């Protein structure tokens, strides 16, 4: 019941789109705190997102649209001000860009600050403010992870045209350098971001500065962190809530495109859903129980066993605890928050309303549309094919306004070509390693350790140096899950994108060959691979570049 309440409440914005919603925030916080102590549901892992191209198939990311053709603002405080300027001030006095510090986290940059972790924490930020008039919405659509010592910003931002979050990385983000923006290797990101969306820890957010012990060490290490105030659980809560809402975008898009179906009946279903979303946004009215009959009929056919609701929650982790818990690994498959056995029409309609241009909704509802009947305008949109089975887009609202003589004139930024970093090479003397591990470990980045990057001689030397840790992680496929101190490599999510189930992989000749290769490397250096699993992983020889680990 607690999870149901959490899903229904936290999936709705506490802003102008939901009357009296701010009164719910104290109750939402109590629910979240209770959930931190609740056991995980014993349900199967949520379905993994199919393999997707790194570059957007359509459109561009919200981050690209925000930056345009200009360099990424530097330093970070300037970038934060640029983002803040797109959003309305928070009525409660908090920044619209909610930001916290994580010195000992679980991201790819977890070792970038070593040995000065508290002097160089990771900055995690979520856009949580309503957009200003004429500005594309950023709320729940833009998330940042900045690391000063790593000279990098990891960006997750929404692409309305493709109905997906894009993963990007800003490299060379440092004084005297020109920041370079790339679309990241999507499969690498999805190993942890299993819903292709942002993730965050469950309460009590002990990795963040909300933990008094963490905050105390941060204050001792440094006086100023890019103008960011050390915050309590309030900021962490808002970031958590933003990731919850963002992960529901895929649910609303699925119901919009697939739930309603194709053809005229599907178009009319979407017209009814859009009309209900506008009615909720303008007047706060919820849909009737018998609304969307086409969705109800299609549900039984498309999802006879229910629709899994994505889970963005990592287990809460105290990095200062004496004993690490393997269950906190973000690579482990996560169960869905819930399985919907029937369509939650109220949540669907409220979710669609939450994806609209908030400033345009308020302006049209109060000053222009008033209580006008929108049915004729929506019918014209349907006749033109604008309600076909394609991604739900805030531009639909602008199309409705245009029907009433209020055209939307967006400022179209000239964007540089979208680009990715160099491709992985699956040839050479280490073909097996490159094939099985190159997606994550053959890159110019230091994290995760790029022991497969370079010519054959360099790769061989790096494999020698990393052999102990590679052997340890590969060997965990032959250890029962309950006895593992780390997640095995390659991650199960990466295997799944290649159509390999974990049981098949554990018995595969490929895994045996990888193990034999590193076993021989360890012995050639005078080591004993047979005893490595009895040692704590952190005591094994550090992988390259020091002190990172695979």
Regions found by a protein language model. Name each.
Residues 27-39:
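Bacterial N-terminal signal peptides
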Residues 40-46:
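Signal peptide processing junction and immediate N-terminal pro/mature segment
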Residues 46-89, 99-105, 230, 234-550:
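Aromatic- and Gly/Pro-enriched helix-to-coil junctions and flexible linker segments
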Residues 188-258:
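Mixed-charge (acidic/basic) macromolecular-recognition segments
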Residues 91-119, 131-135:
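N-terminal accessory alpha/beta regions
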Residues 118-219:
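Acidic/His-rich structured neighborhood in mature extracellular/periplasmic domains
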